[in-house]
Amino acid sequence: MNDTSELIMVAMSGGVDSSVAAMLLLEQGYDVAGVSLQLKSNNEPYGNGYNLKLINRAREVAAALGIPHYVVDLSDIFSQRVIADFCQQYSQGRTPNPCIRCNYYVKIGALLEKIPDFNAGYLATGHYARVLSDENGTHLLKGADEKKDQSYFLYTLPPESLSRLIFPLGKRYKKDIIRLADKMKLPVSQKESQDVCFIPDGDYKSFLATRMGFTPGKILDKTGKILGEHQGLPLYTIGQRQGLGLASNEKLFVSDMNPEANTIMVASHDQLYTSRILLSNFIWRESRIPLDTPGMIVKVRYKAAPAEVKKISQTGDFYLLELASPVWAATPGQAAVIYLGDMVLGGGIIEHGGDVA
């Protein structure tokens, strides 16, 4: 984008990344305004005070930068699209990634629909990712800082959204962003963002307990032998070892959950490795790149080490991902995001890891 006369709305959380993103755009001569999201209704018991604290901090940063600051209430769509799905997924023994849905539906999706109300043409965020536009279209790329790259959380964004997005931090490194914030004495928090912003204390159990009941059930081994009792599927995730309450000479981990039977299966560490993963809601962003292109890698969790993709094939409404080497604890509900070099090719939601019929 070269037209500095068109207003850019910067999604501001009060954190260092979005604050420096706004500052960098100002330094480049752009017309900038800040916008923060009201994501909690007044009757929401969890996280409302935390959300208001962030909004107030963003307002302070905007004042320090000398730019207008606005608040947009997206609490309804956030509740419907993010929190409700989060709870539903956990009730089924899955482990969702709410940030991906939030970016698609709320923080980017819904906010892009709002910015014309402010006569703005673009939305900027503090994500560590890049957008490349060329004769083949608009592409999503990793951020330059591999340790902070957030393209994983953005893989569902359509090209028409990417074409209106600006990522000022895409070519920068976190250490430099912190240095810039200190140099400009911006009133921001240096703490990393919460994994799940609507559970700022990290107490998933208490959060879920306000929205659903927990039904105890059996813990089984691979042979079907009953080893113990679990306290409710939402309290567990694939790969979990702590909190099982099992007396065993072998280290056992949650390997599978059956919501219909309300059972949890456990297995040894090595038995959680798989080189076959079934994906739903599959997205392929780059139609010009075949599914059998060599050199593709996949991340099955945000912090997971990448694994080489051997083959992608369609099976009914799903896609089967076959890997050159196994990954550990492929978790239903998490996203598997596929890359070729720095480019995000697509991905889907993990339904099952292991032998797929």
UniProtKB/Swiss-Prot annotation:
Enzyme Commission number(s) of this protein: 2.8.1.13
EC class: transferase
Residue ranges, annotated region (Interaction with tRNA): 148-150, 301-302
PANTHER family in alphabetical order: MITOCHONDRIAL TRNA-SPECIFIC 2-THIOURIDYLASE 1, TRNA 5-METHYLAMINOMETHYL-2-THIOURIDYLATE -METHYLTRANSFERASE
Positions of disulphide bridges: 102-197
Function description: Catalyzes the 2-thiolation of uridine at the wobble position (U34) of tRNA, leading to the formation of s(2)U34.
GO molecular function: ATP binding; tRNA binding; tRNA-uridine 2-sulfurtransferase activity
Record GO biological process: tRNA wobble position uridine thiolation
Site residues, Interaction with tRNA: 127, 334
Gene name of the encoded protein: mnmA
Record family assignment: Belongs to the MnmA/TRMU family.
Alphabetically ordered keywords of this record: ATP-binding, Cytoplasm, Disulfide bond, Nucleotide-binding, RNA-binding, Transferase, tRNA processing, tRNA-binding
Localization: Cytoplasm
Residues reported to bind ATP: 11-18, 37, 126
Reactions this protein catalyses: S-sulfanyl-L-cysteinyl-[protein] + uridine(34) in tRNA + AH2 + ATP = 2-thiouridine(34) in tRNA + L-cysteinyl-[protein] + A + AMP + diphosphate + H(+)
Catalytic residues as annotated in Swiss-Prot or TrEMBL: 102, 197
GO cellular component assignments: cytoplasm
UniProt superkingdom: Bacteria
Protein name: tRNA-specific 2-thiouridylase MnmA
